[in-house]
Amino acid sequence: MADPYRVMTVCTGNICRSPMAEVVLRDRFEAAGLAGRVVVDSTGISSEEHGNPIDPRAGFALAARGYGVPVRSARRVRAGDLVAADLVLAMTEVHAQALRRIAGADDAAVRRVVMLRSFDPAAPHVAPGAREHVLDVDDPWYGGPDDFEVCLTQLEAAADGVVARVRADLAERPART
């Protein structure tokens, strides 16, 4: 069997947006019949929440829409994560910039960093080299339940586009004998 395609979602502390995106994407990959070929993980650019579980408000939002709530611990992204991933999905422009700095001189790793909302067909188009902030996934941390619902809606809106991209990437991988 071929190595799995690795998707990593990244936010600030790895307790709200990125684990929610991880859950949504795992669900969509399973529905698309790709669960055995794709591994989804999540991290944060900060170590401030390291070891903490998913924010309970994120868990409530996921459960309200029928998703399972993962038992997991937040962790900070490492350079090795960027090397191992096939696709790195940043929640904001600030996250994307931080990830590209972490990738450093590894041009391939830099190219694998993509804004998650760029896969949402209703999101604004951003020209190459232009500012990406218009694609930021709203941070629900300082808000209430409605803010987590908005965030989850943004994540779901991009998920099918991510699945299509991964499916296309998998089709281009050479067959192993």
Language model region names:
Residues 1-85, 164-174:
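Conserved active-site segments centered on acidic
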Residues 4, 87, 93, 97-177:
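Phosphate-binding/catalytic loops
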